[in-house]
């Protein structure tokens, strides 16, 4: 017996997946998803894999997660959407991918539309 529980194993896998999303390592992240990791998995703050990829500007990772069925409007515990995060960080390619996939620019608090107005992002 190794002394490591299934719960601890899953926690380590989840943390690795969150790091992969945050750093834009798309191929490795998608191997986790293809092996059965929930595409809408969230961390302790309610940030999904998609939210982390969007907030850190990884458009290819965002597109891959969307292709795997990620919820483009899933908000975190602070009611922030992936689209609002991308707008806040001024990641136009990420925002475009989310909008193309049907993300709601009025979802969340503040919404992506409100965030764009606050920061003069006239591209939304």
Enumerate the predicted regions with their spans.
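Conserved ankyrin/ankyrin-like repeat signature
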Residues: 28, 60-61, 93-94, 122-124
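Intrinsically disordered, low-complexity regulatory segments in ankyrin-centric signaling systems
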Residues: 1-35, 44
């Amino acid at each position: 017996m190794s002394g490591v529980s299934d719960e601890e194993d899953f926690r380590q896998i989840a943390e690795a997946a969150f790091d992969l999303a945050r750093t834009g390592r798309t191929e490795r992240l998608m191997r986790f998803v293809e092996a059965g990791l929930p595409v809408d998995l969230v961390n302790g703050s309610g940030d999904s894999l998609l939210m982390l990829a969007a907030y850190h500007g990884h458009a290819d990772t965002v597109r891959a997660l969307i292709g795997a069925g990620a919820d483009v409007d899933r908000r975190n515990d602070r009611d922030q959407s992936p689209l609002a995060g991308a707008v806040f960080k001024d990641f136009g390619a990420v925002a475009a991918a989310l909008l193309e996939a049907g993300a709601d620019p009025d979802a969340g608090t503040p919404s992506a539309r409100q965030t764009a107005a606050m920061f003069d992002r006239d591209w939304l």
